[in-house]
Each structure stands twice: as C-alpha cells, then as structure tokens.
Amino acid sequence: MVLAKQWVLKNLPTPGEPFNFHFHDPACTFELIEKELSSEQLKDGELLLETTYLSNDPAQKFWISSMDKNYAKGVQPGEIIPARGIGKVLASRNKAFSPGDYVSAVTGWTTHAIISQENVQGLRKLDKNKVGKLWWYLSVLGGTSLTAYFIFFTYAQLQEREEDYGKVYLISGAAGAVGTVCIQLALNVFKASKVIAIAGGPEKVAFVESFGDNVVGVDYKDPSFKQKLIEAAGGENTVDYFIDNVGSNVLEAGVLLLKQRAMLIACGAISAYNDPSKFVFKGYSFILTKRLVVKGVLVTDNIDDFPKALDKLGSLVKHGKIDLLKSATLEDGTGDKFKNVPLIWKGLFSGVNKGKLITKVNNEE
C-alpha cells in the first residue's frame, strides 16, 4: 500500500480566467488530498504507478478549464489535475508491463496513480538505457520537442536540402520548451541565415543568443520592443517563417516582418491563457495583403509519425545538434515540496523556465 498525495480540482474555474493559487482560501482552485492505493485495488489490465517526473505545459490550462470542447472536456471538482509524466510501475495486472518498468503516461498531479485499462493504451514503455536521465523523455524526446520537429518537417514541409537552407526565422516564446528546440532545428538542421528570437528580459535574451551567432534576441518587455524587433530583422518583409507561441501584441508585431507568401505557424498563445481578450488578432489584413500561409499546430494530430520523429530527435541529440543542458529546467517537487506543484506550473506564465519545465516528484533508481 502507498499513501498517494493528489492535487484535485476544488472549485470550478471560469474558463479563460486566472486560477486561484491561495491554498488556504476556500475559493482556491486546487486542493491537496491523500489517498491510499494498493495493488489489491487493481482490476484486470490496470497498473499502479509511482510518479517520477511531471511535465509542465501551458495547455494544461485548457485541460483543466476548457474553452473549447473540441480540444478538451475540462476537469470536474474532485478529479485529479491532468498532467503528462513519467512513472515507475509498482504493480501490474497487465501482461504488457511489469513492476520496475518506466512508462510515459498521463499521471496527473499525483505521487502515485492507478492507470485504468482504457488509459493503459496510451502508455509508452521507456528504455532507461537509451538516455542519461529519464526526464529526457519529457524534454528533448518529449511532446514539446516533437512539436518543434513537426513544425519544421511537416507543417513547414522543409527538407534537408539546399533550397530550404538559409531562411530567416522569427520565433516567439523562444526561451521556452518549444522555442529552444525550434532555434536549434533552424540553426543546426536547416542552416538558418538568421533567427530572431523573442524572449522576456535581458537574461532570457542572452540565453537565446547563446545558441549561435546567427541568433538575435529581442526583449518583448522592452518599451521599444516593436522598433527593436524591426531593427533585428533588418526591416519589414524580411522573415520567411514565423513560429508563434505567444499571440497578442507579439503576434501582431511579428506579422509585419513576414515576406509576401511567407508562413505563419501558430503553436500557442500563452499571453492570452489568463486573459481571453488577448486572443484578439488585429493583423488579419496582413494575411490577405501578404498572401500568408497560416497553419495551426496540435502535436497529437501527428501521433502516427511519433516513432519516426523520435528517432530523428534522438539522432540530433546524439550528434550534438540539440543541447540537452539548454533544453530543460528541473524543479524539486519531492517529499513535502509536492505541495508546490501548482506553483511550479504557474511559473510557466511568468517565464521562470529556460527550455522545458519539469517537476521531479520521486527519485530515479
């Protein structure tokens, strides 16, 4: 038997509005509970997992409180807060998994979880011997790196050939989980002539510029942001591909830089996740006048190609074209620090992370 700590939804939030993180407030969005779990509770096909790492993703905002039922149904009071993670199998009544196996799963914000037979179908067994640390499967070999891969190879339809080399890229949210890998793919695979990397604050600007001499960082918090963005690009109508993770005024400023018939790839809109008014896009006329190609990205649309993509990402890591140390930030959520799990996730929206933000819940063996 194990005593699981679980963060559950306490109060149903208003879709699009900020969550309440004041844990002693009766109106708090979340509640930390404890629950006894044991192998005796397992039904046929089920697993008992110990969570090792949790992935922190902006999209969890909508997994918890849905604004669009086509994307996610949301969470009801008493249900565990959803999150992807890595866990160790403690007990199994499923022939495909044995105690001691590590798996990628939707664990939720919990130290231990029973995975139903229905959800076992989405599990992926992880080979610990192929990586230095298991958290690599959430960073350079995880969903955000897969997103970056598909942006280039599927949505932009780029190939490793001369005609696709030397392009100019604009990347917003460039210091984040998707952005850092996009910078490296642009530079190290597609030989970008320039990457304009938008990040928040001088430290983040210095971080994105550390990826290479062809990277020009621009601070979106700077009062002269729009002018400095134009200067970094060398003027308007200079960018071939704009990979946007932010939305709002950053998106509107970036569209000005795109060439005619350039491509805008919409990957996220983190600036609007706590303020729906920022979903408004005022640059629609430029889509028409510049004849832009606009594509929206959901990584799960490409699930059949995950094995191929992971092989490629693994090769890029092996050959030093993706830097492991610059691709993730780890936070400690072990023991009593598990109480900080919601606050660690909240840090995404104030930009505490460089690369993928991962919470450690239990030690690897």
UniProtKB/Swiss-Prot annotation:
Keywords: Membrane, NADP, Oxidoreductase, Transmembrane, Transmembrane helix. Residues 155-169 are extracellular. SUPFAM superfamilies: GroES-like (SSF50129), NAD(P)-binding Rossmann-fold domains (SSF51735). Residues 1-133, 191-365 are cytoplasmic. Its main location: membrane. The chain crosses the membrane at residues 134-154, 170-190. It is found in: Membrane. One of its GO terms (cellular component) is cytoplasm. One of its GO terms (molecular function) is oxidoreductase activity, acting on the CH-CH group of donors, NAD or NADP as acceptor. InterPro entries: ADH-like_C, ADH_N_2, GroES-like_sf, MDR_fam, NAD(P)-bd_dom_sf. It is a multi-pass membrane protein. This is Uncharacterized membrane protein YML131W. It comes from Saccharomyces cerevisiae (strain ATCC 204508 / S288c) (Baker's yeast).
